[in-house]
Amino acid sequence: MATGALLPCSRPCPMSRLDFLKASHFSLGPDLRLHEGTMRTTSHRDFAYPAATREPPSLQPPPALLFPMDPRWDREERVSEAHRAFPPPSTPPWELLQAQARERTLAMQAGNLHLHEDAHAGIGLSNAHAAYGWPELPARTRERIRGARLIFDRDSLPPGDRDKLRIPPTTHQALFPPHDARPQPRAPSCHLGGPNTLKWDYTRQDGTSYQRQFQALPGPPALRCKRASSGVELGDCKISYGSTCSEQKQAYRPQDLPEDRYDKAQATAHIHCVNIRPGDGLFRDRTTKAEHFYAREPEPFVLHHDQTPESHILKGNWCPGPGSLDTFMQYFYGQPPPPTQPPSRHVPHEKLQSHVTLGEPKLLKRFFKTTMGSDYCPSEWRQVQKAPNLHLQQSYLPRGTGEFDFLTMNQKMLKPHRTPPAPVTEEMLQRCKYSHMEPPLGGLRFFSTQYKDEFPFKYQGPAALRLKNPQEGFVPLGTPHQRGCREKIDPLVPQPPMYLCPSQQ
């Protein structure tokens, strides 16, 4: 600045110092200087904002066109069909807009927001605000807003009692007051059935069945830790948790309205749809149909011609008690001696059965047993009652007899130390020899071998070894003797052999 003061000014400054400072700052609102010499769109030309000046139409002669034009078209204003059909709304006079802008500027200056004035018109107004203004606020609302802004400018918190002094209402709360808090109930229309004919024995019950059955024990409330306590108290703990609300909801609540605007008793009297609460209401779920047409218990179904047994599947323990789960080894070797009787070295023959005779009829029903045979047993057969023994161990795995007839050479040589079995008598050997099963054909042996001839089914004398060719066989050639159709043959009677053995010849 000092250098500029010493040097001679080549040209005078067009603006003073204050104007220069104003021009160096930004200004709000449209700047008309920006639109000078710029191309405008069709919408800006047809729908210009109020501050803009419409350019006069050029009077230059139009260039020669292919089709001749009517000279009356140039004199008429060129507008679009939509603009001609729907003209824009009438704008307020320019003086009214300037007065509104001046009031708004004074209100903004009162809030410590100082803006430099601009020489251009329409400062602080947008195009939409200038074209489409909203309705003005009442004078009382303006004073409240202006006073609230002044208080807010001085201090963020208004002076006075903070519990009684609330935040001033907003523009929406001032312009749109709430409706009537207690509207008058309307009479029910006739086409909806008229007044409610159902009379319910409804009484208000705030507590539930769970609260009635499981009541809390009386006692002081639990003490809270100081570190866990909060400075924000959401309601009074002595009253209940019903008045719990946040600070924003408490500040921006409807003015001069009761706390409980919903009358439950009044709503219950005029309601048609009854909500049944499970377990709390007095409605016992009784209907006319349930009272008069009650469900009767059905009679038991009995089938008189049913001869089917209970089940064809054998149960696991049909005859419970000791001795019902015996194994084959325990059955043949008898029960172990009681602890009072000392064990003897030789087991008597009455308690020992070392061989299974396949042809003995007494053991037929014990070992060859089916499901049907056990379910449909004959009347003369009775189950053997076994002596109770407390030292009998339950086992489902048959272990076999373990005698020398079913042992290998290794098992015969390496025997564990146990009670030796009784010696085999001659009577037992003879009974074992003569108790084999006889085939139904008797002595007719169609496919005989050397082994079968030397060791036949029935005992035919002492066994004698013969030195013969083992490849030689005795297969009958031809067909056997054909008997008549009416001839009866007893299969149990031994038949004469077709080819006699060499010893019998």
Curated annotation (Swiss-Prot):
Mn 4 as annotated region, ranges: 448-462
Ranges where the record places region Mn 1: 125-137
Region of interest (Disordered), ranges: 172-194
Region of interest (Mn 3), ranges: 407-419
Residue runs in coiled coils: none
Tissue and organ distribution: Highly expressed in testis.
InterPro entries reported in the protein's UniProt record: SAXO5
Protein name per its UniProtKB record: Stabilizer of axonemal microtubules 5
Species of origin: Homo sapiens (Human)
